[in-house]
Amino acid sequence: MLGNYKCVIASKSQIIDKWDEEIKRHNDSEEWKIYKKQSLSNMDTRIVYMGLLDGKIITEATAIISGKDKCMENKDDLVDNGKVYLSAFRTNKEYENQGYFSKLYKFVESDLKSKGFKSLTLGVEPKEIRNIQIYFNWGFTKYIKTGFCKYANGEVAIVNYYEKELN
């Protein structure tokens, strides 16, 4: 099933290619152009991970490793002091529910642990029941706080934040 699938720390050109693909997939959305600009302006505070199947990017995740990130909201207790904030979990639709993202997540966790980080944090909207179940299964069971997240389209969402210790 996972065949020629490999996980990598993305290069800048891979990040640009993936953003261009997402923008195209979202009908040249201004919102996605804003996300691309934010991502590229924070390259020194983030590590972008990708899963490649036969060389094609099919999964991705971003680790925000510094509170100096200019675009992260609700930073307090989520990043710095050994904590990394995980975000932008994406899997191309046709590859969902096949284990690809789980393999990428394990790669991300292992890499961040090897770099000396002590815990991982993430945020999830309360309505995303399936994702909450997955994150709890992965060990994100320590509740940190609830906050509001404003998306590029102006929408505001309630987000619950959780932490997982890396042992």
Predicted segments with their positions:
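Conserved GNAT acetyl-CoA-binding A-motif
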Residues: 112-124
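Conserved beta-strand in the GNAT
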Residues: 50, 56-75, 85, 90
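Conserved acetyl-CoA-binding loop-helix of GNAT-fold acetyltransferases
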Residues: 91, 97-110, 137
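Active-site rim helix/loop that mediates acceptor-substrate recognition in acyltransferases
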Residues: 24-54, 62, 68
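Short amphipathic alpha-helix that is part of the acyltransferase structural core
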Residues: 1-35
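Short hydrophobic/aromatic beta-strand element in the GNAT-like acyltransferase core
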Residues: 46-50, 60, 88, 121, ...
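C-terminal "cap" of GNAT-fold acetyltransferases
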Residues: 125-129, 137-138, 144-167
